[in-house]
Amino acid sequence: MNYSQFLNMIPEATLMVVLLITFIADFCSSKSADRKWFNPLVCLLMVAHIVINIFPTEATEAFGGMYTTGSAAGVLKTILALGTLIVMVQAKEWLSRKDTAFKEGEFYMLIISTLLGMNMMVSANHFLLFFLGLEMASVPMACLVAFDKYRHNSAEAGAKFILTATFSSGVMIYGISLLYAACGTLYFDDIAKVISASPLTIAGMVFFFSGLGFKISLVPFHFWTADSYQGAPTTVTGYLSVVSKGAAAFTLCAILMKVFQPMLEYWTVLLYIVIVLSITIANLFAIRQSDLKRFMAFSSISQAGYIMLAVVGNSAMSVSALTYYVLIYVVANLSVFTIISSIEEHNNGTVQMDSYNGLYKTNPRLAFLMTLALFSLGGIPPFAGMFSKFFVFMAAVGTHDIHTTLGAWAYGVVFIALVNTVISLYYYLLIVKAMFIKHSDNPLPTFQSACSTKLALAICTVGIVAFGICSFVFDWISVAVNA
């Protein structure tokens, strides 16, 4: 084996170093001691990883072309690493509890392992490497979902997650086997050269799409989402809702546009149907929720529909819009989950929406920051979420002629998405109404968040405001994608 090939895998190599140092530091230090230095150490290692890999790199490959990377994949890996860093910073308060402090090292090692698997997925040019990366991300994620294993809800959520992940992986493997039977290869480039629309390849594409649809929580593959989000620790739920979803969505986009390009008409229609169902059904279910984590679960299903809307444009603009949307979604959604986690720690673990009644009077800063994040998720200007939705809508219709069948479908789906954006504003404003207008006989007491929570919220809030105002962010992503 030529170990110099690892030099072409700098993002993965640096993550392996971060994982190794984290393991050694955890192994060599006493878990009974006060380890205030451990979280800053891991976070600094992640910052170093981001700094090393933040600039777009030239296209490289390794392992006989099974692994390929370029500037577009590099940008997404940086965004995923940023989301992971925010989760690590935000997790400090939760991991300081007596029942979780002794598992702090395990948490960081699991979360870094999932990120490593996602990086492999993003850079895969072969279905074998893609599947290995997917499982490398899924197995540690199941452990994270069941991290509070002595809580019934967390153990149940972990069981549901692993069963669903197993089933979806089986469906995906079956689809890949059909594609191999039809094309005789598992390399993405080689499949794209020989694939054509036949019953076998169409079935393979549908099964593969269905398997990855489970990972992204697209309707009708979403049934596990609400229960797993509700039962998992809030910090893990935030990570699952943004980083995992972003990696899977980017990978699906790349495979559809690269491998299944000759079958464009088939997967585009399939995407139209799934997008409309995801956005509409998730919005209708979100309105009925009283538990905030279940509420955010259906919100994430709806956001997944918007993310995939960019793919139907089938252009470089699609990849740019999807990557930018994931970036904005990371900071906005993690801001919401950071606040939920902080309030949960000071409110006896309650995440019911009515417990937020009158939050503005007792904790005005948290109420204000929550409002900013919800406005961004809803697409209200001038926050970054509005621009991300605008670019997604532009990407969806940009290359389509309205006089063609696919073009008419594209414009129709964008119109439905616009209508659903208004519906989503209604249910996001339900939380704002609870915080600013509704009164409570037993309001949440005034409290001071931990410094780590304040830092995570500062990073997210700066992103929500700055990424919308600074147009160079989208320009930088576009240049990287087109490089």
Set out the residue ranges of the language-model regions.
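Alpha-helical transmembrane segments of multi-pass membrane proteins predominantly involved
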Residues: 1-483
